[in-house]
């Protein structure tokens, strides 16, 4: 595992999240905070199916990690009052693996496949027939004497989750009757999520402290809940157990999470780009060497948020720091900076140091 995966602002699921994250999951569409369009559309799909007494269309949920795709799959099963079977794309290496799982489904069950874009091709091709006709063809024997035996399966609803919808094949994507894209959350939505989580965990937190955590959570509930637990630890050990604004800020400083939600590696990349390469352009490989990381780590882990936050711009010649990046590091951007007009939502001005005096 990459060291950056253990960062408190990593959107990936960590072992430390464990059972605590499960206890914080919403149990119904009404409990689910955020994603209003997806919730409204899903409610219509599910309630329409219940009124008809049929199984709903297959559902594909896409979006970055940590936004609630697994929680939504659990809610779908709960709303339908049926069992949820959970697996993942990498676990389905052979068609037989999928056939065994499908044959054990009861009518109306929900089958959730996480990372469905990573499913093996033989299993994917078997899934086509299962999704359309609720049937699988099991091949018995090998060579010229092999025969295909059709096997009926109970009508079910497939819920697929993916962080890379573009990696899905066309035939698989087309078989989903409903596709919902999960967007990053607004600070106000994260604030409500944190207040709900604090109540469940028994954390005494002031509203402005919760707002501070929400503002550093990269628009991701998983990160917000993880930071809440880390701040709670700090408050219990070094304060009186109450999370106030000063306590929250001090705790987040200890865990190297700055005002924009950048961690140590993010800031190292930004600092190398601005101070080491005068704002760029510079290639990812060169930037990775400068911070002592693999190029894939910089490109896949750090860069997406830096670009989304308006701190880094991708150009044909390489990565370029925006005016917001210079200002976030407390520096004055050069006057001829091409990307100086890019704004960062929620960015506050800081004292700056002019390197060009």
Curated annotation (Swiss-Prot):
BP term (GO), one: DNA recombination
First-level EC class: hydrolase
Chain sites annotated for binding Mg(2+): 70
Domain of life (superkingdom): Bacteria
Pfam families: AAA_lid_4, RuvB_C, RuvB_N
Region (Large ATPase domain (RuvB-L)): 1-185
Chief site of localization: cytoplasm
UniProt-annotated stretches for the region Disordered: 1-20
Catalyzed chemical reaction(s): ATP + H2O = ADP + phosphate + H(+)
GO cellular component: cytoplasm; Holliday junction resolvase complex
Annotated region (Small ATPAse domain (RuvB-S)), positions in chain: 186-256
MF terms (GO), sorted A to Z: ATP binding; ATP hydrolysis activity; four-way junction DNA binding; four-way junction helicase activity
Keywords, comma-separated and alphabetical: ATP-binding, Cytoplasm, DNA damage, DNA recombination, DNA repair, DNA-binding, Hydrolase, Nucleotide-binding
Matches recorded under Gene3D superfamilies: 1.10.8.60, P-loop containing nucleotide triphosphate hydrolases, Winged helix-like DNA-binding domain superfamily/Winged helix DNA-binding domain
Binding site for ATP: 24-25, 66, 69-71, 132-134, 175, 185, 222
Annotated function: The RuvA-RuvB-RuvC complex processes Holliday junction (HJ) DNA during genetic recombination and DNA repair, while the RuvA-RuvB complex plays an important role in the rescue of blocked DNA replication forks via replication fork reversal (RFR). RuvA specifically binds to HJ cruciform DNA, conferring on it an open structure. The RuvB hexamer acts as an ATP-dependent pump, pulling dsDNA into and through the RuvAB complex. RuvB forms 2 homohexamers on either side of HJ DNA bound by 1 or 2 RuvA tetramers; 4 subunits per hexamer contact DNA at a time.
Domain notes: Has 3 domains, the large (RuvB-L) and small ATPase (RuvB-S) domains and the C-terminal head (RuvB-H) domain. The head domain binds DNA, while the ATPase domains jointly bind ATP, ADP or are empty depending on the state of the subunit in the translocation cycle. During a single DNA translocation step the structure of each domain remains the same, but their relative positions change.
Family: Belongs to the RuvB family.
Subunit and partners: Homohexamer. Forms an RuvA(8)-RuvB(12)-Holliday junction (HJ) complex. HJ DNA is sandwiched between 2 RuvA tetramers; dsDNA enters through RuvA and exits via RuvB. An RuvB hexamer assembles on each DNA strand where it exits the tetramer. Each RuvB hexamer is contacted by two RuvA subunits (via domain III) on 2 adjacent RuvB subunits; this complex drives branch migration. In the full resolvosome a probable DNA-RuvA(4)-RuvB(12)-RuvC(2) complex forms which resolves the HJ.
Name of the featured protein: Holliday junction branch migration complex subunit RuvB
Organism: Nocardia farcinica (strain IFM 10152)
Gene behind this protein: ruvB
């Amino acid at each position: 595992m990459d060291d950056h995966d253990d960062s408190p602002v990593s959107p990936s699921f960590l072992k430390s999240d464990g059972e605590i994250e499960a206890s914080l999951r919403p149990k119904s569409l009404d409990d689910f905070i955020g994603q209003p369009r997806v919730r409204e559309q899903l409610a219509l799909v599910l309630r329409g199916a219940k009124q008809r007494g049929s199984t709903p269309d297959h559902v594909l949920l896409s979006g970055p990690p940590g936004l609630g795709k697994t929680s939504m799959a659990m809610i779908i099963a709960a709303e339908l009052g049926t069992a949820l079977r959970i697996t993942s794309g990498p676990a389905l290496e052979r068609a037989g693996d999928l056939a065994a799982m499908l044959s054990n489904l009861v009518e109306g069950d929900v089958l959730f496949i996480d990372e469905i874009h990573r499913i093996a091709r033989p299993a994917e091709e078997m899934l086509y027939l299962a999704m359309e006709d609720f049937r699988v063809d099991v091949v018995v024997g090998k060579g010229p004497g092999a025969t295909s035996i059709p096997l009926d399966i109970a009508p079910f609803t497939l819920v697929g989750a993916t962080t890379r919808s573009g990696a899905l094949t066309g035939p698989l994507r087309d078989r989903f009757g409903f596709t919902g894209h999960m967007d990053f959350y607004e600070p106000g939505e994260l604030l409500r999520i944190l207040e709900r989580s604090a109540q469940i965990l028994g954390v005494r937190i002031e509203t402005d402290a919760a707002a501070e955590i929400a503002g550093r959570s990269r628009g991701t509930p998983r990160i917000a809940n993880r930071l809440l637990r880390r701040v709670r630890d700090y408050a219990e050990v070094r304060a009186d157990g109450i999370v106030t604004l000063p306590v929250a800020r001090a705790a987040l400083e200890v865990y190297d999470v700055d005002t924009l939600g950048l961690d140590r590696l993010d800031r190292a990349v930004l600092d190398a780009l601005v101070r080491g390469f005068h704002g760029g352009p510079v290639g990812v490989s060169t930037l990775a060497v400068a911070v002592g990381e693999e190029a894939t780590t910089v490109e896949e882990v750090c860069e997406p948020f830096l670009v989304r936050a308006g701190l880094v711009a991708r150009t044909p010649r390489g990565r370029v720091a925006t005016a917001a990046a210079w200002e976030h590091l407390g520096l004055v951007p050069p006057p001829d900076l091409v990307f100086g007009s890019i704004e960062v939502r929620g960015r506050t001005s800081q004292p700056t140091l002019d390197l060009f005096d």
